[in-house]
Amino acid sequence: MIATLLTFSLAAMLLTLTPGLDTALILRTSIAEGRKNGFKAALGINAGCFIWGAIVALGLGALLAASQVAYDCLKWIGAAYLLWLAIQLILARPQPLDIASTSNQPKTTNWFLRGCLGNVLNPKMGIFYVSFLPQFIPVGQSPVMWTFLLVSIHVVMGTLWSTVLINIAAKASGYLRQPKIIQWMNRVTAGVFVLFAAKLALSSR
């Protein structure tokens, strides 16, 4: 049992350290919107992991893996959502540091929700959990309990790595949170979102 957990932890660590959509969202949010909003985005991403864990534990993930229609619907919704995020970043008007750092700045963006939806609307995450987690559930053990245990390990690692990224980004934000730099960063992040949207739209199970 210990060996199983150690093997899963190693695999989860490699997955966590691999740069992707979550990394881009956390870095951009932490630099342009501040440490607090960076943590909100990270918590949303982790909440999305728990939602997928619950879906897999309840057996609904098998439906996603078996049904092409269900997979395609979630895939296109996820791709459309990423494109919407990209458009929002492109149209965003960056503010200078002295304005962006004040408490009077309107807080209209729910970064927790954005992080969560970005994860939940990615069917690849569901397929990954469906195909990956069962390999580490010992025979005769409760699938529900072990699914949430494994997801919790993944989330803890994700939280630790997100904390490192957020702190690095927050320290650099004083130099990077300038209108032109934020605009450039928004466009780069938007480009990353568009690439992931295209990859998702063209993907198959």
Say what each PLM segment does.
Residues 53-57, 121-126, 193-205:
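Hydrophobic alpha-helical transmembrane segments in multi-pass integral membrane proteins
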Residues 147-170:
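Hydrophobic alpha-helical transmembrane segments of multi-pass membrane transport proteins
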Residues 6, 10, 105-117, 145-149, ...:
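Alpha-helical membrane-protein architecture signal
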Residues 2-72, 131-150:
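Juxtamembrane transmembrane-helix termini in multi-pass membrane transport proteins
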Residues 36-111, 168:
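Membrane helix-loop-helix hairpins that form the core translocation module of multi-pass transporters
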